């Protein structure tokens, strides 16, 4: 009998959802940085074997929205509660159990198995961990709690074992050669945005959107033109940097990662444009592929 199902990963920002997703899928699907709100979209990673297909979804961290982009991000997270066969709620040893109580209440009401994963347990001691497990059991009594460390891979195999046991009998939902629902262009934009998150401070990374305007691929190489959109002229100057050095660094590091990702030579040109207040515009967000009510 073949098994298949949707395993959706939810939780607050910066608890290790994307790192866990990449581990479970065995591919670098989601960008992962030390900054919160790195993930903006819902991203599927598909794990295939002869008798099983697990469709993982990484989702944005749950936040109280301050602008329309964050509303879209919350929509992605809430939709993951509706269509899951198994829900992975990821927290960590630092996070308070009552953070984002409204979202936790929605998790409490889901009708599918919930695995509550307490990440980063290498940062605490056994006594505090026991107290944390008890506190989470009170918050989500139906959840099966598994302490993990995504960075050291501790107990990740236990998580995978439970997923396989809980997965429903079903034919595959996608072709067995498919490993994600996203096109190649999406990963280009995410890798460029990852470098911006790493190399710029404060509000700059959160004011950026990346669009691929040209993607031409042949047997050995890919030619890419990408536009980095910011909200203000002052941000454009910061992204470009003195004599273009900052932008050149981003492009160089992105090219290296893209060559590893695609296993081809990459020719990357980057441009910076201003799209005023795009994070608060329904029209622009839809143009950039975000889910709006």
Name each region found by the language model:
Residues 184-293:
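P-loop NTP-binding site
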Residues 27, 46-50, 84-87, 94, ...:
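Conserved, well-folded catalytic cores of nucleic-acid-processing
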Residues 113, 122-180:
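Canonical P-loop GTPase G-domain recognition
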Residues 1-75, 79-81:
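Conserved G1/Walker A P-loop phosphate-binding module
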Residues 58, 119, 149:
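Active-site glycine-centered loops adjacent to acidic/histidine catalytic or metal-binding residues
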Residues 51, 75-143, 216-218:
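Conserved C-terminal guanine-recognition region of P-loop GTPase G domains, centered on the G4
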